[in-house]
Curated annotation (Swiss-Prot):
It catalyses: N-terminal glycyl-[protein] + tetradecanoyl-CoA = N-tetradecanoylglycyl-[protein] + CoA + H(+). The keyword Phosphoprotein does not apply. Belongs to the NMT family. SUPFAM superfamilies: Acyl-CoA N-acyltransferases (Nat). The lineage of its organism: Eukaryota, Fungi, Dikarya, Ascomycota, Saccharomycotina. Keywords: Acyltransferase, Cytoplasm, Transferase. This is Glycylpeptide N-tetradecanoyltransferase.
Length: 452
């Protein structure tokens, strides 16, 4: 649903409340939740639904760090704040258990993210990470972890304007405590801790629509093991198709086809880093990495095996011409006697010099050169993911993905991912979708951020 549709829905909700003299008891549970979220976000420095942006920039000016409150925000008596030390076994284990048991599930409660300790080490400990930005809420009496939110440092660039920022992620509250209004207090507390470090902006994403997305992308799925996906209910058998036909449709070549494609090593970092930075400049919303961040996000380390996979293509002169990466984040399969886990690969960042000779990204020849090259690269990535026992490969409609999604048999998913900026007002950025939410191969996306 687009911003205008959600704005209209909220307007109807407000009118209903006015007719009933503000009596929320006449609202459904879902309507009450939507209204509470609306009330909270109305107090925050975020863009409003349908707001006309005349000048892009910060909503509130930076404050003095010494003016930020020193004390954490008060919790209900039975809870207490806890800074989570994920370098130690028990805190990492507690975060691991909380998210695996309570984080995002699909609507039918059939699949749930299966986070690994290695994934958390990669996602939560980039260069510059701070322990105090891993915020937990424990039950005072038992010590049980019941809520978590995190921030990691990043540098954002919005239409060429750079700002020190954080990426907010992994907001999770125990299922039985979701009526306790912990989410707003978690957001306020992580904001306080980040402000204490003289950072006033944040990037975050959500499947739900809040005030107000800067960009919206759609999830897409490319089956690698169609038979297993069908067995567990991830995909259905289309009308007028047989299982044999579906298996044939999604069969990939036995080995990668791009000449010279190989795993990226530390020796490739300089060339890949330069290529990546030049490629990213075409987008209106990006994260900029320094070289140590680039190494972390694309090579990982001994704490993060089997999480991030990066590949390069080097020409005969030793120049890196292509770079592509994906990460692994499996699903736990609930209520299925045959399968316990679904292997999932996620397209991360990539870059190619295929269209660098053209000033205009949308020049027809440049577009065709890039489309052909990306199609070859991502097809090989699907083969590599299949060989790593992944069952499906996911991508958003961000970046230049709309050029290859249809040709490579990525199907549109049910889910959309909305991107938000905290304390920054900007005009919407294309997310690779047409008005009717189809892949927009003509205009593509100007959204160049991939969030975990």
């Amino acid at each position: 649903m687009g911003d205008s549709g959600d704005a209209q829905k909220m307007q109807r909700l407000l009118e209903m409340l006015a007719l009933n003299s503000g009596d929320m008891s006449k609202l459904t549970q879902q309507q009450r939740k939507a209204f509470e979220e609306y009330k909270f976000w109305k107090t925050q420095p975020v863009a409003r639904f349908d707001e006309k942006v005349e000048e892009e920039g910060p909503i509130n000016p930076p404050r003095r760090v010494e003016d930020v409150r020193d004390e954490p925000y008060p919790l209900l008596e039975e809870f207490e704040w806890r800074t989570m030390d994920i370098t130690t076994g028990q805190d990492l284990e507690d975060v691991f258990v909380l998210l695996n048991e309570n984080y995002i599930e699909d609507k039918d409660s059939t699949f749930r993210f299966n986070y690994t300790r290695e994934f958390f080490n990669w996602a939560l400990k980039p260069p510059g990470w701070r322990k105090e930005w891993h915020v937990g809420v424990r039950v005072r009496q038992s010590g049980r972890l019941v809520a978590f939110i995190s921030a990691v440092p990043t540098t954002l660039e919005v239409r060429g304007r750079e700002m020190k920022s954080v990426e907010i992620n992994f907001l999770c509250i125990h299922k039985k405590l979701r009526s306790k209004r912990l989410a707003p207090i978690l957001i306020k507390e992580i904001t306080r801790r980040v402000n204490k470090c003289d950072i006033w902006h944040a990037l975050y994403s959500a499947g739900i629509v809040l005030p107000s997305p800067i960009s919206t992308c759609r999830y897409t799925h490319r089956p690698l093991n169609w038979s297993k996906l069908f067995d567990v209910g991830f995909t259905a058998l289309p009308a007028n198709a047989t299982k044999t036909q579906m298996l044939a449709k999604y069969t990939l070549p036995k080995k990668p086809l791009v000449e010279g494609l190989r795993p990226m090593t530390d020796a490739d970092v300089d060339g890949a880093f330069d290529l990546f930075n030049r490629y990213q400049k075409r987008f209106e919303l990006i994260q900029t990495f320094d070289k140590s961040e680039f190494r972390h996000w694309f090579l990982g380390n001994e704490e993060t095996p089997s999480v991030i996979y990066s590949y390069v293509v080097q020409n005969s002169e030793g120049k890196i011409t292509d770079f592509v990466s994906f990460y692994s984040l499996p699903f736990t399969i609930l209520k299925n006697p045959l399968h316990k886990e679904l292997g999932i690969g996620y397209l991360f960042y990539y870059a190619s010099d295929a269209d660098f000779d053209y000033e205009d990204r949308y020049d027809p020849t440049a577009t065709e050169l890039l489309r052909k090259r990306l199609t070859q690269l991502i097809n090989d990535v699907c083969i590599l993911a299949r060989d790593l026992k992944m069952d499906v490969f996911n991508a958003l409609t961000s970046q230049d993905n709309a050029l290859f999604l249809e040709d490579l048999k990525f199907g549109p998913g049910d889910g959309f991912l909305n991107f938000y900026l905290f304390n920054y007002r900007a005009n919407p950025i294309r997310g690779g979708l047409t008005e009717d939410k189809k892949f927009d191969a003509k205009n593509r996306s100007n959204q160049g951020v991939v969030m975990l």
